[in-house]
């Protein structure tokens, strides 16, 4: 039986932001670079920032986030943190960690309304720090929080120091580890050729299913592309007599969008980004009879300041000294200049292998080669990802895009804007996981 249809996105702005940010990051980075990032983390961080914004800055943030008010954003954050991102590892499901924190210089005072929103809606910790006299100690405190919050899986949210005039730091960390519901057999993994956009071919390790293998995988065939959905295990094995889990139980999948043309990725991504509802509408919802299934193992990293990307989406005042309005974040002491956001630093790591990954998935569409009756046997569907493709990790009950990216060369770990060669420390014992951490510094101008 097919699972219940996934819900519409909790806020269309989340999906739209995911697609727009992905295209702008790629446009500003290496043209042949891979990409992984967490739209959900960026969205949640900006939503928390909006809780302390006013005037044109708030209007900009609401416009980019696709929301009508601060209250709407706070409600969305609460639903996601309490439902979609609830940790289900004790029940046999994915291990999820989603945490936020706000640090402010001890000479500042957070406004009560912002503090309440941060704690109650965003479930964030708020702490005073000595950014002026002991900036190194403050950075260590923030990084220690990240390590504790993620069981040492995320080591730092701040690399190096902070600007001397830092007043507020907002940090968020997301971690997801899931095992495939139907794991790949390691013995079937073989080296093959992956065709890059420049026409060159590189060696890659392809995970495979057996020929004509009836799996728990989902494949949808569309004009010019196919979509593969690989569900992650969401619970311990139950006896046949056990009742099914409630519909609200979080479910995650990895969704791979593969163009038919070897060089068709950019056209496909443009179509996804420009057509409202396209992403969810094209996801498969029924099992497929698979002929040949090949997906390369890959590990991607990303590290970079995406403030410029967000400026390009319309956050001009937000990142402009003298124009930003964060008057709702701290109390006015009469002698301090207003706050301005200088940067949004984003880091992400993903590794995919035979055992699992990080997951989120959803949607509905017609699937090729499937039938609800045993006869006639469905025509097997091939899905051979031997050329550039896009991927999305989606939480199905909410439609939230937790992670997104694309693979242009599975033999390379570096992503667009990636400037950090030390991200391997985030991946432990070869387990499949997404790791993401990002921080934002608010500084007085």
Swiss-Prot record:
UniProt keyword annotations, A-Z: Protease inhibitor, Serine protease inhibitor
Region entry RCL, spans: 356-380
UniProt-listed InterPro entries: Serpin_dom, Serpin_fam, Serpin_sf, Serpin_sf_1, Serpin_sf_2
Gene3D superfamilies per UniProt: Alpha-1-antitrypsin, domain 1, Antithrombin, subunit I, domain 2
GO molecular function, one term: serine-type endopeptidase inhibitor activity
Signal peptide coordinates: none
Pfam families: Serpin
Residues with site note (Reactive bond): 370-371
UniProt entry tagged with the keyword Transmembrane: no
Keyword Iron: no
Any one of the GO CC terms: extracellular space
Similarity comment: family membership: Belongs to the serpin family.
Record's function text: Probable serine protease inhibitor.
PANTHER family xref list: SERINE PROTEASE INHIBITOR, SERPIN, SERPIN-Z5-RELATED
Domain remark text: The reactive center loop (RCL) extends out from the body of the protein and directs binding to the target protease. The protease cleaves the serpin at the reactive site within the RCL, establishing a covalent linkage between the carboxyl group of the serpin reactive site and the serine hydroxyl of the protease. The resulting inactive serpin-protease complex is highly stable.
Protein name: Putative serpin-Z5
Species name: Oryza sativa subsp. japonica (Rice)
